């Protein structure tokens, strides 16, 4: 706590290997043992005891495992030798297994897509925090929203959410290209990058790092603090003999031009983290059920007795003759085992998966109504999705806020350089604007917009709120409305006299 931020950063720069230290992802525990010896003891309601420091052990889950869990063609059930097989006797009296294809189900991908849609399905909501904005401020606000939409920043954030929910973390870099245009770039584990963030004891970011390997096998570290971009490599060392940089060399240290680290990072659980075991159970039961259905699904013809191998066919029917002495031969069709219990068990697992992951799988067969469905019915049906998305809005707010701050700062530099607004840096710095996610759910746009009109007519919301909340406004809608009011307020020209 006593060390200053710069002292800690300098220590990282002197020992680059420390930048590679990363807290692992975990899931569950390998033991049931409780380290707190007082657990389960009796005590008085007003008693006190010395606090026990946390020592909870967790099981590490690698990001490579996340990647395999996301890919249905890499699931464990495909390599499970405990799935039963069908054994038959061949013509030569030997036995062999019938080839049976195992099935990996893409639950993880479905959960990922539904959670990403629930959080990112709507455009970001922008709010200008100024009770009486000037015309210049309105113009700058409209310009910011237009450039945000034109450069597809919503889509970039959606991809960032999808990557974090797939592999555990993601990095979004805001930078200025050679033409002085503000651009964005995504770093993900799937593309060969490790995202590592170092913070001080108060949780304030110190260094945001990207660790990767190039095509020649040389490892690199790109580290960003509030001022500089540091590039390290473990290639040909240029360090002196007295340098203790752990084999890493500082290639460059450049001023990145932003007021804070331009790398926006987010870390968290993958979308299916709480239900992975249930998904594996569902896959095992499903594959066992498929084997049973393939072997016995169409029933069995059971023949008892000594049957003459030469069968007769009369009027399209095959006649089997029992040649046994006691004449107790019989033929009957054995019905296949009823699948109802297995199907009910699979459905119960599916219900637990939906509850555990916080999203709902609704298929067309589940919709029984042929008319319009009320908004309340939709909310009740998709309550799991709405609750998860509402929680995700809070969890992702810092990510969106930093992304907006960096984009606004970069856009101001771009507008100054291309001459569109020479005062953009000062004006954009004074513009107090925020952005946030708005959870998505199916709804009737006409009814929603009509509700906004009704609220505006009743004086319960302002015109500005209606512009921001409705689904058809353009980014510069306030400017358009202001221009329209100005034109309507202009006095009409005097009519020309014919006299």
What are the residue ranges of the model-derived segments?
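Extended, helix-rich architectural segments
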Residues: 1-182, 496
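Glycine- and charge-rich intrinsically disordered segments
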Residues: 1-8, 12-14, 280-283, 290, ...
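A short, surface-exposed helix-loop junction/capping segment
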Residues: 137-145, 327-332, 382
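Extended, regular secondary-structure scaffolds
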Residues: 158-265
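Extended, charged amphipathic alpha-helical segments
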Residues: 5-6, 240-379, 420-422
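Conserved aromatic-histidine-acidic binding/catalytic patches
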Residues: 58, 80, 96, 128-129, ...
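Short amphipathic alpha-helical segments
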Residues: 136, 140, 148-157, 164, ...
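C-terminal helix-loop subdomains that flank or include functional centers
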Residues: 320-326, 341, 348, 352-499
């Amino acid at each position: 706590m006593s060390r200053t931020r710069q002292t800690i950063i300098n220590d990282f720069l002197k020992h680059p290997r420390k930048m590679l230290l990363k807290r692992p992802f975990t899931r569950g525990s390998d033991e049931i043992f409780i380290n707190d010896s007082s657990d389960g003891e009796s005590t008085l309601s007003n008693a006190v005891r010395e606090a026990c420091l946390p020592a909870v052990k967790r099981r590490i889950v690698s990001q490579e495992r996340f990647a395999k869990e996301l890919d249905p063609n890499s699931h464990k059930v495909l390599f499970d030798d405990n799935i039963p097989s069908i054994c038959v006797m061949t013509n030569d009296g030997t036995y062999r297994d019938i080839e049976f294809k195992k099935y990996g189900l893409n639950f993880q991908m479905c959960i990922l897509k539904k959670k990403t849609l629930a959080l990112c399905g709507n455009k970001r909501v922008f709010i200008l925090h100024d009770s009486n904005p000037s015309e210049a401020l309105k113009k700058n606000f409209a310009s910011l929203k237009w450039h945000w939409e034109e450069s597809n920043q919503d889509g970039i954030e959606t991809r960032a959410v999808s990557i974090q929910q797939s592999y555990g973390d993601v990095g979004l870099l805001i930078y200025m290209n050679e033409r002085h245009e503000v651009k964005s770039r995504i770093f993900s584990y799937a593309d060969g990058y490790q995202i590592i963030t170092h913070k001080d004891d108060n949780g304030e970011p110190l260094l945001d790092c990207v660790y990767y390997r190039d095509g020649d096998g040389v490892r690199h570290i790109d580290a960003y603090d509030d001022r500089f971009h540091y590039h390290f490599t473990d290639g040909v060392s240029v360090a002196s003999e007295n340098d203790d940089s752990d084999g890493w060399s500082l290639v460059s240290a450049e001023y990145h031009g932003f007021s804070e680290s331009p790398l926006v990072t987010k870390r968290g659980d993958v979308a299916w983290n709480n239900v992975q075991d249930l998904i594996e159970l569902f896959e095992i039961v499903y594959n066992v059920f498929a084997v049973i259905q393939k072997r016995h699904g169409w029933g069995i013809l059971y023949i008892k007795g000594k049957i003459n191998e030469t069968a007769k066919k009369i009027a399209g029917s095959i006649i089997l003759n029992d040649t046994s002495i006691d004449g107790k031969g019989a033929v009957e069709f054995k019905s296949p085992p009823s699948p109802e219990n297995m199907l009910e068990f699979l459905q119960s697992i599916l219900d637990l998966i939906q509850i555990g992951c916080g999203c709902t799988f609704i298929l067309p067969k589940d919709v029984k109504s042929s008319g319009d469905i009320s908004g309340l019915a939709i909310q009740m049906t998709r309550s799991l999705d709405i609750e998860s998305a509402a929680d995700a809005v809070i969890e992702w707010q810092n990510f969106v806020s930093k992304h907006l701050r960096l984009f606004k700062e970069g856009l101001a530099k771009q507008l100054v350089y291309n001459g569109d607004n020479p005062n953009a840096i000062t004006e954009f710095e004074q513009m107090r604007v925020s952005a946030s996610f708005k959870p998505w759910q199916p709804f009737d746009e006409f009814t929603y917009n009509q509700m906004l009109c009704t609220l505006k007519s009743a004086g319960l919301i302002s015109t500005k709120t209606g512009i921001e909340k409705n689904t058809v406004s353009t980014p510069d809608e306030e400017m358009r409305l202001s221009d329209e009011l100005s034109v309507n307020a202009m006095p009409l020209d005097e009519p020309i006299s014919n006299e």
